[in-house]
Amino acid sequence: MIRIVVAGASGWVGRELVRAVAAAGDLSLVGAVARSAAGRDAGEVAGGPALGLAVSATLAEALAVPSDVVVDYTKPMW
C-alpha cells in the first residue's frame, strides 16, 4: 500500500486526487492539506463520502503521519 498526502486538497485538481486515491485499492490517503478546509473531512471536501481523515492546515501537520508520496497541487507563492 502506497501512503499518499495531497497538498492543495480543496482545489479542483486536489479534490480529484483525493477521490482517486480514496478509490484506488493499492493507495492509501494518509493526509490532505488545505488551509481553507482545515479540520473538515477530506472526503467531504472532495465532494465524496466522509473518509475519516481531517484536512490539515499545514504540510508539517500532515507529515506527522508516515507517508511515501506527497502530491503538491498548491498555488505557488512567488
Please give the residue ranges for each predicted region.
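NAD(P)-binding Rossmann-fold cofactor-contacting core
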Residues: A23-G48
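Short acidic-hydrophobic, aromatic-tinged amphipathic segments that line or gate anion-handling sites
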Residues: A54-T58
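Extreme N-terminal starter segment of soluble prokaryotic enzymes
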Residues: M1-V5
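Surface-exposed acidic, glycine/proline-enriched linker/cap segments
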Residues: P49-L53
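Beta-loop-alpha module in the N-terminal Rossmann-like domain of NAD(P)-dependent dehydrogenases
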Residues: L59-E61, V65-W78
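Conserved protein kinase catalytic core
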Residues: G14, A37-R40, W78
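N-terminal Rossmann NAD(P)H-binding glycine-rich loop of SDR-like oxidoreductase domains
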Residues: V6-S10, G14-R19
